Each structure stands twice: as structure tokens, then as C-alpha cells.
Amino acid sequence: MTAANQNYGTGRRKSSSARVFIKPGSGKITINQRELDVYFGRETSRMIVRQPLELVEMTEKLDLYITVKGGGISGQAGAIRHGITRALMEYDESLRPVLRAAGFVTRDARRVERKKVGLRKARRRPQFSKR
């Protein structure tokens, strides 16, 4: 891809990170050299990816080229959404308030809580027996 008339955004969520390049086009979304429908089997993940574009009504106006790595399906979808949002803001700064109101600009800082010593999981204690 050439650097002319394209915008870039980096998105992160959980342990996933996505690099999003947008340029004027017909609405084609390519993730890791695969179509959106092929890459994400679940409709919910596809919906999450499309949310910022649908909000600003640019679904058919921009082509997206995305590389994403790390994490699982949900984290990758969230990272892509965050990256698309940042790329859209670079493309047109006037979209920021609309995207901010929808909550797409803020990076979701929630992470998996670590497992503690003496517990079964992060917070799950071993079963207590009185006798």
C-alpha cells in the first residue's frame, strides 16, 4: 500500500493489537489478507468491527486494510474497532465528538486479573470444610 491519501490508526484491547489503514474506496474490509466475513465467523465480532463506520455513515466510502495479532476473537474485534476509530479521527477530526459520545475513542483498559497464590483462580477460593 502506498502512503498517499491513506490514514492510519493503532488499536489495542486485552492482549490484541491492530494496525488499521483506511483509504477512499468502496467499503472493502481486509483483515490479515482475508475478508471480514471469512476472518470473523461470529456475527457479533463483525458487528463490533463495523460499529464506528456505521456511526459516521462511511461504510461504503472507505476501504480498510487491517493487520491484527495477539489475543482471541473478542479482543481482536475490540482492537480493530479502536484502530478504526483512531484512523477515522486522523481522516476527519470533526468525527471525534460523535465517536467519543459512542465510547469508541477510549481504550478499554480492562485486563485479565492475575491468579493469586493459595487461590484456585484470581479470586476463587478453595472450598471451605468445617470438619
UniProtKB/Swiss-Prot annotation:
Coiled coil: none
GO cellular component, one term: cytosolic small ribosomal subunit
Keywords, alphabetical: Ribonucleoprotein, Ribosomal protein
Claim: Flavoprotein is one of the keywords in the record: no
GO molecular function terms noted in the UniProt entry: RNA binding; structural constituent of ribosome
Record Pfam families: Ribosomal_S9
Biological process per Gene Ontology, one example term: translation
InterPro entries, A to Z: Ribosomal_Su5_D2-typ_SF, Ribosomal_uS9, Ribosomal_uS9_bac/plastid, Ribosomal_uS9_CS, Ribsml_uS5_D2-typ_fold_subgr
Superkingdom field: Bacteria
Family: Belongs to the universal ribosomal protein uS9 family.
Name of protein: Small ribosomal subunit protein uS9
Gene that specifies this protein: rpsI
